[in-house]
Curated annotation (Swiss-Prot):
Disulfide-linked positions: none
Recorded catalytic activity of this chain's protein: P(1),P(4)-bis(5'-adenosyl) tetraphosphate + H2O = 2 ADP + 2 H(+)
Keyword set includes Signal: no
Gene Ontology molecular function: any one: bis(5'-nucleosyl)-tetraphosphatase (symmetrical) activity
InterPro entries cross-referenced by the UniProt entry: ApaH, Calcineurin-like_PHP_ApaH, Metallo-depent_PP-like
Native source organism of the sequence: Salmonella schwarzengrund (strain CVM19633)
Coiled coil: none
EC number: 3.6.1.41
Descriptive protein name: Bis(5'-nucleosyl)-tetraphosphatase, symmetrical
Keyword Hydrolase among record annotations: yes
Broad enzyme group: hydrolase
UniProt KW keywords: Hydrolase
Signal peptide: none
UniProt similarity note: Belongs to the Ap4A hydrolase family.
Length: 282
């Protein structure tokens, strides 16, 4: 009865299956946690979604910015970019079923027994856990409703970048989406910076990685996240687990077995290219 946490798959189906075989994942008894960005860049987004959906209650996942971008393409809001390699998925006979399932997935996972929280980009230090839960539910409710295309059309943008309980409407939903799926750096007060993508040692002052700023959630829970492949899984404080190691760029797909904190990796089938093409502003 093991819990396996795996970083951003990005359509790397063959590597995902090989990694699960390596750890002897058994859906009947084990649980798989996925940090989001299941799709795009790799060649197997369709197979990834079909497989993950088939796992039912054996999987716990969160949505990432590329997953949201896929939903926006599906809704006719965003352009299908060839480099994302999404056409086989969008043209599949079960595309409607898969994508309507995908849009009903959460932005946040919490296991109180394990004191473990997972979100694609992390947890902004401006939130306590109750606020994070409420904010996740706000976006999840819209995504699972019939009005989800209206939200997807309005989610693109970098502002507002400072949390306030007084935020409302689309501005509130956009901040929540950015915090859960796009965040990397913050100002010392926790305000989001949506522009810098430099490695932490090269980040302009006064910016800090979100996980370097103490917050209520990181002080009480472990946090697993993906999104930031250029970290290569390194440089985070104790209890903060960066799991995106750039499989779709030629790096590795990384798995953390929670019970003993042992790592497993599956090398990418692609050539190394760690230039993160994060043009998706979802």
């Amino acid at each position: 009865m093991a819990t396996y946490l795996i970083g951003d798959v990005h359509g790397c189906y063959d590597e995902l299956i090989a990694l699960l075989q390596q750890v002897e994942f058994t859906p009947d008894t084990d649980t798989l946690w996925l940090t989001g960005d299941l799709v795009a860049r790799g060649p197997g987004s369709l197979d990834v979604l079909r497989y993950v959906k088939s796992l039912g209650n054996s999987v716990r996942l969160v949505l990432g910015n590329h997953d949201l971008h896929l939903l926006a393409v599906f809704a006719g809001i965003s352009r299908n970019k060839p480099k994302d390699r999404l056409t086989p998925l969008l043209e599949a006979p079960d595309a409607d079923e898969l994508l309507n399932w995908l849009r009903r997935q959460p932005l946040l996972q919490v296991d109180e027994k394990k004191k473990l929280v997972m979100a694609h980009a992390g947890i902004t230090p401006q939130w306590d856990l109750q606020t994070a839960k409420e904010c996740a539910r706000d976006v999840e409710a819209v995504l699972s409703s019939d009005s989800y295309p209206f939200f997807l059309d309005a989610m693109y943008g970098d502002m507002p970048n400072n949390w306030s309980p007084e935020l409302s409407g689309l501005a509130r939903l956009r901040f929540i989406t950015n915090a859960f799926t796009r965040m990397r750096y913050c100002f010392p007060n926790g305000q989001l910076d949506m522009y810098s993508k430099a490695s932490p040692e090269n980040a302009p002052a006064p910016l800090k990685p979100w996980f370097a700023i103490p917050g209520p959630v990181s002080e009480a829970y472990s946090i697993a996240f993906g999104h930031w492949a250029s970290l290569e899984g390194k440089g985070t404080p104790e209890g903060i687990y960066a799991l995106d190691t750039g499989c779709c760029w030629g790096g590795e797909l990384t798995c953390l077995r929670w019970e003993d904190k042992q790592y497993f990796v599956q090398p990418s089938n692609r050539q190394m290219d760690m230039g993160e093409g994060e043009a998706v502003n979802a």
